[in-house]
Curated annotation (Swiss-Prot):
GO terms for molecular function: odorant binding; small molecule binding. Transmembrane segments: none annotated. One of its GO terms (cellular component) is extracellular space. Its main location: secreted. Residues 1-15 form the signal peptide. Pfam families: Lipocalin (PF00061). May be a pheromone carrier. Acts as a kairomone, detected by the prey vomeronasal organ and inducing fear reactions in mice. This is Allergen Fel d 4. InterPro entries: Calycin, Lipocalin, Lipocalin_CS, Lipocln_cytosolic_FA-bd_dom, Maj_urinary. Keywords: Allergen, Behavior, Disulfide bond, Glycoprotein, Secreted, Signal, Transport.
C-alpha cells in the first residue's frame, strides 16, 4: 500500500510539473521581463563560439502591443559588452522574424512562463543557412534536469554544438543599463 501511495504521489508531482509547460497558444505577455541566457546551440559551431555573431546574451524581452517582441541583448565586442536591441515581428502563431546576421525565423518551442523559454531559430544568411537553439531562464542558472532536456531537444534536431553559457562571461555586469530599465516599464 505504501508503495502504491508513493507511486501515486510521484505521478502527481510529475503531472503537475508537466502541466505548466506551454507548447502552443503562448501568451507572449507572460514572457515579458528579465531573462538570462543559459544554453546556446547551433549546427554551425563558429556562430556560437567566442566572437561568433550569434553569441548573444539576453537581458530582457518585452511583448509589444502589435504582438511583436523586443529584445535587449548583450554581446562581447573586442572584450567589451555591447547592447543590442532587436524587434522580432510576429508572422503567425508562435513564429517570428528578425533581421540580424541574415534573415531569421524563430519559434517558441516551449515555456514555463516563470521559469524558462526554449527558442528554435533558422537563419538564412548569405553563406549558408543554420539552426540556433536558445534556452533562457528567469534565474542565472537552472537545474541539470532542464539542461539535459535542452541537450536532448538539440540532439533530436541534429544539433551537436552546445554551449553552457553559465560557464562564460555573459555580460551580467552590463545588465540594468538605463536604456534597458526604461524598456522594462510597462
Amino acid at each position: 500500500m505504501k508503495l502504491l501511495l508513493l507511486c501515486l504521489g510521484l505521478i502527481l508531482v510529475c503531472a503537475h510539473e508537466e502541466e505548466n509547460v506551454v507548447r502552443s497558444n503562448i501568451d507572449i505577455s507572460k514572457i515579458s521581463g528579465e531573462w538570462y541566457s543559459i544554453l546556446l546551440a547551433s549546427d554551425v559551431k563558429e556562430k556560437i563560439e567566442e566572437n561568433g555573431s550569434m553569441r548573444v546574451f539576453v537581458e530582457h524581452i518585452k511583448a509589444l502591443d502589435n504582438s511583436s517582441l523586443s529584445f535587449v541583448f548583450h554581446t562581447k565586442e573586442n572584450g567589451k559588452c555591447t547592447e543590442i536591441f532587436l524587434v522580432a515581428d510576429k508572422t503567425k502563431d508562435g513564429v517570428y522574424t528578425v533581421v540580424y546576421d541574415g534573415y531569421n525565423v524563430f519559434s517558441i518551442v516551449e515555456t514555463v512562463y516563470d521559469e524558462y523559454i526554449l527558442l528554435h531559430l533558422l537563419n538564412f544568411d548569405k553563406t549558408r543557412p543554420f539552426q540556433l537553439v536558445e534556452f533562457y531562464a528567469r534565474e542565472p542558472d537552472v537545474s541539470q534536469k532542464l539542461k539535459e532536456k535542452f541537450v536532448k531537444y538539440c540532439q533530436e534536431h541534429g544539433i551537436v554544438n552546445i554551449l553552457d553559457l553559465t560557464e562564460v562571461d555573459r555580460c551580467l555586469q552590463a545588465r540594468g543599463s538605463e536604456v534597458a530599465q526604461d524598456s522594462s516599464v510597462e
